Design a protein with these regions (language model features):
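N-terminal metal-binding scaffold of metallo-dependent hydrolase/deaminase domains
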Residues: 1-43
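Active-site metal-binding motif and surrounding structural segment of the metallo-beta-lactamase
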Residues: 36-57
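Metal-associated gating/positioning segment near the N- to mid-region
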Residues: 53-117
């Protein structure tokens, strides 16, 4: 395969210029200004050629936070449809969460998921639970789960309310050099999850979920991260104060990482009034001031990861009243475009800075040999037109629960390549 005429964007090296890429046996073998079948002895006349003129060629995107709902909830999504959605969105690697049924808290369930994931065209990693059955009480065997292939640990979807248990889990993860990711919402503060406590919840006649519910646990866990030395990920950060807390503890030396989702840096709580349950998620969309602080955190590097929290639900579930419908939206197929639309086109981040948070940063955190375009590296690419406008309307995901349907976005994935194979083409 030869990818020609595109701008190669590699955040790991800072490369951002017109280059061709020669791929052989799933690896990048040459990056040069002009590679042709005739001039390069390693190429043959049968080479597949992708003309990337007018496009950017970036490393295959990596999402550290997806829910494929498999096993147990496959009416919402499964490993196959989730992988198709990932490929359509430019993602070649994903990290699946552990809140399935059964929970990924044991070696057998972990190995089953990983075995089925290997049948797909993307690279599927699996995080294991921190606690048995996500109850926040009993330790899992982290060492055995790491040995069996877990890439990290998380009880995502449910917060760890016991500080001593959380601290012990961080210490154990640190010994194994494994990241531990935390869902930060203290249920003691929350009456109605998924909607911010504020003007919108008041208009709906409900109490909602105040930002202090997140901030209190973020403050606690940033301190525990500092003391434990663990790589701690604050998942789907939604509060501006939470961003400030993370920044403060990073300066103190804590090995803290933070995820921002495209919905939290694009939308505010007002979206609930327009889109109803399609804009309901945990943690909820908050105020414009919170959104601006999340963007500031992305700009200064406090937030080093952009992750989707891809959370499919059925149309029947999302059609329930706002207090009864489940929280969460799909995100794999719109993530890159939302980053371009909300961050790059508005001048907040450069294209390399956006891609850094979606490729090399997650790869380094999870010790993945991906996320870069360099000779000898895996031939994983997202090839996209940064200026093409489009409107999301049909999805490869089994579900379609998103407020972004019908919204004009800029930046369209044209090809996704994983291991030297085209796994998605916009044709």
């Amino acid at each position: 395969m030869i990818i020609k005429n595109g701008i190669v964007a590699d955040p790991a090296s800072g490369l951002y210029e017109h280059m061709d890429i020669l791929v052989k046996d799933g690896k990048i073998v040459k990056i040069a200004p002009d590679i042709s079948c005739a001039s390069d002895a390693a190429a043959t006349e049968k080479e597949e050629i992708i003309d990337a003129a007018g496009m950017i060629v970036g490393p295959g995107l990596i999402d550290t936070h997806v829910h494929f709902r498999d096993p147990g909830f496959t009416y919402k999504e499964d490993i196959h449809t989730g992988s198709l959605a990932a490929a359509k969105g430019g993602f070649t690697t994903v990290v699946c969460m552990a809140n399935t049924k059964p929970t990924v808290d044991n070696v057998d369930t972990l190995k089953d998921n990983l075995t089925r994931g290997k049948q797909e065209k993307i690279r599927m990693y699996q995080a294991a639970a921190i606690s048995h059955s996500l109850k926040g009480q009993d330790d899992v065997d982290m060492a055995a789960l790491k040995e069996a292939g877990a890439c990290g640990f998380t009880d995502d979807g449910i917060p760890l309310t016991n500080a001593a248990f959380c601290y012990r889990a961080m210490q154990n993860a640190a010994k194994l050099d494994m990241p531990i990711s935390l869902h930060e919402e203290d249920p003691a503060f929350i009456k109605n999850n998924g909607i911010n406590h504020g003007k919108v919840s008041d208009a709906l006649g409900i109490y909602g979920s105040p930002s202090i519910a997140e901030e209190a646990l973020v403050a606690r866990d940033c301190l525990l991260a500092l003391r434990s030395g663990a790589d701690v990920v604050i998942q789907h950060i939604s509060s501006g104060v939470s961003v400030d807390i993370v920044r403060t503890y990073q300066k103190l030396g804590a090995r803290l990482h933070a995820e921002a989702t495209p919905h939290h840096f694009t939308l505010t709580e007002d979206a609930v009034l327009e889109h109803g349950t399609l804009a309901k998620m945990n943690p909820p969309l908050r105020t414009e001031a919170d959104r601006q602080k999340i963007i500031k955190g992305l700009i200064d590097g406090t937030i080093d990861l952009i992750a989707t929290d891809h959370a499919p639900h059925s149309a029947e579930e999302k059609s329930k009243p706002v207090t009864e419908a489940p929280s969460g939206i799909i995100g794999l197929e719109t993530s890159l475009a939302l980053g371009i639309t909300s961050l790059v086109k508005l001048g907040h981040l450069s294209m390399l800075e956006l891609l850094e948070k979606m490729t090399i940063n997650p790869a380094r955190l999870y010790h993945m040999p991906y996320g870069t375009i360099s000779e000898g590296a895996a031939a994983d690419f997202v090839i996209f037109d940064p200026d093409e406008k489009w409107v999301p309307c049909e999805y490869a995901s089994k579900s379609s629960n998103t407020p972004f349907t019908g919204m004009e976005l800029t930046g369209k994935v044209k090809y996704t390549v994983c291991g030297g194979n085209v796994i998605y083409s916009d044709k």
